[in-house]
């Protein structure tokens, strides 16, 4: 299931599983999976996206965008479903399965897909002006020069109230 780790941590864990399969320490492939309840796979205004305060926590963009991105980056399967433990109607979940068979191809896929899977959700939250997400995506861009995320420009509430 899920791990509360950043992209780097998840990639290292997945690499360890893939290497264990390659070396024979594990006798069969490993499937990494996520159904919901994570940084990027769920739009749920009562749980996963409850820390998005710009009104967009009720949209399904993150789950949909995420499974499309995961599929392009090597997921073995992706899924879109509703519910996720908080009921039907206002929640959409995007999940994936990723087969780690010990191959170099699996290593390439795990790096591409897990990097996207985590940072897509962090980016989405940063665009909604979540302070922790802005911090996290800036940190990730500092580690990886290929990652370019447009950062939000915050406006003082008093300025908005004055003009609107």
Predicted regions, residues:
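Conserved internal helical-beta-strand scaffold that buttresses enzyme catalytic cores
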Residues: 1-164
